[in-house]
Amino acid sequence: MAHKKAGGSSRNGRDSEGRRLGVKKFGSEAVIPGNIIVRQRGTKWHPGANVGMGKDHTIFALVPGHVRFETRRGRAFVGVTPLAEAAE
């Protein structure tokens, strides 16, 4: 009698997908308005100059320029250094 008894279904074998969080544009990278710089939960990075923050704490560029990361008073800030204005 080389038979197996009917096995019950496994209760394992599922997991949630990753959330794709983190830095999307790194220091000195060029950005245009609307580019997402950081996707995060909470304010791991705080908004600095020329960036906005969405309701899910996503930091995005408001002006064309280059990304800048800095630390002030123990907090990490993300900003955008604007491109030099064209000569009039």
UniProtKB/Swiss-Prot annotation:
Q: List, alphabetically, the PROSITE patterns matched.
A: RIBOSOMAL_L27 (PS00831)
Q: Which InterPro entries match?
A: Ribosomal_bL27 (IPR001684), Ribosomal_bL27_CS (IPR018261)
Q: Which GO terms describe its molecular function?
A: structural constituent of ribosome
Region annotation Disordered: where it falls in the sequence: 1-24
Q: Gene3D superfamilies, per this entry? A: 2.40.50.100
List, in alphabetical order, the GO biological process terms annotated in this UniProt record. Answer: translation
An example GO CC term for this entry is:
cytosolic large ribosomal subunit
Q: Which family does the record assign?
A: Belongs to the bacterial ribosomal protein bL27 family.
- For this entry, the protein name equals Large ribosomal subunit protein bL27
Q: Which gene encodes it?
A: rpmA
